[in-house]
Design a protein with these regions (language model features):
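N-terminal targeting sequences that direct proteins away from the cytosol to non-cytosolic compartments
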Residues: 21-252
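C-terminal motif of bacterial Sec signal peptides marking the signal peptidase cleavage site
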Residues: 16-19
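Bacterial N-terminal signal peptides that target proteins for export
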Residues: 1-10
Length: 253
């Protein structure tokens, strides 16, 4: 009887401990990749400091032929920042208060309200201090969130990846590459490998090709661009062309 009472007491203790414990236990971060919730007073958000933050977070992704923002932002007033909003994966909290802060400073915390979450806090005594900080550290915020998302993707791909891509590249091209697991359609030739998720929306394609090194000009931008164009022209004739590539799309492995 004493043993049963001890077990019941221990069980009740564990239940109470779980009920009283705070933190992100059991809560997973929500939201989509490259989305950030900005928590900031409305007056500041509508003012010059908010404009500076918006311009940085939505700055163009470098290297793309068209304009595309690096991050998608959602604004929330501090008075409404509660509940499910606190579980979002990327959060930026901006505090402007001259009675508390003497200079602009930035910090971050992982897993504050949910696992897999990062919360960045930017404190400053004035809107001008926010602007000065942004000018002194251009793209610091956007680069941080982009790096966080890249690391998340790396961690996910280390655990869950396409064995089709990995096995073909490893066996036929002496390469190892962790591609998204939904990339199961592929075409493989001697010097050219293509994989795709073949999705109607959100389609993702991966291309790997090799060519011989001939002279130092091989590594110039002009040569690499010309080589890329010639390889893709040969292997990707376009949707209108009924070529081996188009046929491969309809009957892939």
């Amino acid at each position: 009887m004493k043993k049963i009472s001890l077990q019941i007491s221990l069980l009740m203790f564990l239940v109470l401990l779980g009920a009283c414990s705070s933190g992100p236990v059991g809560k997973r971060a929500t939201g989509l990749a490259y989305e950030v919730v900005v928590v900031m007073k409305k007056a500041d958000w509508d003012g010059s400091s908010g404009k500076a933050i918006k311009q940085e977070l939505t700055s163009d992704v470098p290297g793309l032929p068209q304009s595309e923002p690096a991050l998608k932002i959602t604004y929330v007033d501090p008075s409404q920042f509660d509940g499910l909003l606190t579980y979002v994966r990327n959060i930026l909290i901006v505090n402007i208060d001259p009675s508390i802060y003497t200079k602009a400073s930035i910090s971050y915390e992982n897993d504050r309200w949910a696992k897999g979450q990062v919360v960045v806090t930017l404190n400053a005594p004035s809107p001008e201090a926010i602007i000065e900080y942004s000018q002194a550290h251009p793209k610091a915020l956007v680069d941080f969130f982009v790096k966080v998302e890249m690391n998340r993707a790396i961690g996910q791909l280390e655990k869950d990846y396409s064995t089709v891509v990995m096995d073909n590249l490893k066996n036929n091209h002496d390469l190892m590459l962790n591609a998204p697991s939904n990339m199961t359609y592929y075409r493989d030739t001697t010097d050219f490998f293509w994989a795709s998720n073949n999705a109607n929306t959100g389609r993702t394609d991966l291309i790997v090709y090799t060519f011989p090194y001939t002279d130092p000009n091989t590594f110039t931008a002009e040569y690499l661009v010309a080589k890329r164009d010639s390889v893709l022209k040969e292997n990707l004739p376009g949707a209108a062309a009924e070529a081996p590539w188009s046929q491969a799309m309809s009957g892939l492995h």
